[in-house]
């Protein structure tokens, strides 16, 4: 446990609640003190949904500490069972309430005797895993519970569908453009002649989990959530899974070819070949392939970028920038420390350096040191970019309200390639455009600010030096200002004049 004002991945109970609230007609009971119950507010604020967040907090207060929690927890479970009539009630402690070391499984067993709903305790170690790991584990636990229940009742659907079908695993609430991605995946699969059997957990019903084995194979679009479920289904029912993220032209092609391989391995009577579909989509539907060869994109060649986010999106974005757009990635990083080995393996050869950390200050310092032309990261990197006056495109959760758009903005599939191309192009500040804006806008309206993460500055610029600085084109002015101030600090100069600017230029070898 640590105190922080920004966390990339939250505590474990947030992941569990995200999975529970993604399913339809599932209610979550959170055994927690006041202060841990911010999930309701966060989800209600960010997700564009009409329904209330189905989470009830069983508050740990002084009365509970004096008498024990059992009576209150069991009462909350049975009350919600009568009021909401859910299919499943999921009980989760938080890292704070876990300190009490109570036998919550005993509470669940007792409540289950009095409830019509299924009651389940989230099997997550709240001290050892983060939000994403807990979400992955909780999804697998719920799927396993309902499949084993169906096996006992002898009503498990294991007969495969006549036409090729698929389950999409890992779409869930508060994910990065997950609902748009799901829609785009459905369109892509439909065009390939593949029906979607189930999508879980987003919008799915726990009562339909017994139908998962009917599908021919599974798709896991994001590594962070769904992989454990796919591995479980493969082990139990020999269901293959595709875990390539179809983000960017190259990976979307690999994704479709992998699907063809899976279908050919299952159905020996038919031959599945999607080459013609790939060619048509790449040439006519996706504008990204054409855009990558245009003069606009060639202007971005060898521009420096920094990428940071969850493992799935950071890897995909790094490969898109380098392979498809010719942009140099100075540093690729992720906050998914549990997936560090896979991340390093994937970005090897695509970037100059790798940063794996969940400390936002290290990421901010790295960006300030590299001084990229653009950043592609989370909401935090957007804040860092604003302070350093470096444009930032948001490509990964955690994100704020502007990345839960009402319009259709997928990042996966061929329509996703268009969105990414727009995001990349619009994120870079184009030199001539910036210069023209300043010429016609006038320099008196544009104030030059210090480009560093620290806001205090003991340096003074003379009027002449400021005027000279304003004559420098905007797209390199920030670098000149930082180099001059760095030179001044090294030489203990307090007032920066034109002479100091030229001396700094000489020392930099420019």
From Swiss-Prot:
One Gene Ontology cellular component annotation held by this UniProt entry: chloroplast
Gene Ontology biological process terms from the UniProt entry: light-independent chlorophyll biosynthetic process; photosynthesis, dark reaction
Catalyzed reactions per annotation: chlorophyllide a + oxidized 2[4Fe-4S]-[ferredoxin] + 2 ADP + 2 phosphate = protochlorophyllide a + reduced 2[4Fe-4S]-[ferredoxin] + 2 ATP + 2 H2O
Localization in the cell: Plastid, Chloroplast
Residues binding substrate: 431-432
CDD domains per record: Pchlide_reductase_B (cd01981)
Keyword Cytoplasm assigned: no
Binding-site positions, [4Fe-4S] cluster: 36
Key word Secreted present: no
Record key words, sorted: 4Fe-4S, ATP-binding, Chlorophyll biosynthesis, Chloroplast, Iron, Iron-sulfur, Metal-binding, Nucleotide-binding, Oxidoreductase, Photosynthesis, Plastid
Cross-referenced Gene3D superfamilies: 1.20.89.20, Nitrogenase molybdenum iron protein domain, Proto-chlorophyllide reductase 57 kD subunit B
Pathway(s) of this molecule: Porphyrin-containing compound metabolism; chlorophyll biosynthesis (light-independent)
Residues the record marks as active site: 296 (proton donor)
Necessary cofactors: [4Fe-4S] cluster
GO molecular function terms noted in the UniProt entry: 4 iron, 4 sulfur cluster binding; ATP binding; metal ion binding; oxidoreductase activity, acting on iron-sulfur proteins as donors; oxidoreductase activity, acting on the CH-CH group of donors, iron-sulfur protein as acceptor
Co-factor note (free text): Binds 1 [4Fe-4S] cluster per heterodimer. The cluster is bound at the heterodimer interface by residues from both subunits.
Functional summary from the UniProt entry: Component of the dark-operative protochlorophyllide reductase (DPOR) that uses Mg-ATP and reduced ferredoxin to reduce ring D of protochlorophyllide (Pchlide) to form chlorophyllide a (Chlide). This reaction is light-independent. The NB-protein (ChlN-ChlB) is the catalytic component of the complex.
NCBIfam families for the chain: DPOR_BchB
Subunit structure: Protochlorophyllide reductase is composed of three subunits; ChlL, ChlN and ChlB. Forms a heterotetramer of two ChlB and two ChlN subunits.
Alphabetized PANTHER family for the sequence: LIGHT-INDEPENDENT PROTOCHLOROPHYLLIDE REDUCTASE SUBUNIT B
The protein's name in its UniProt record: Light-independent protochlorophyllide reductase subunit B
Organism from which the protein derives: Stigeoclonium helveticum (Green alga)
Gene (UniProt): chlB
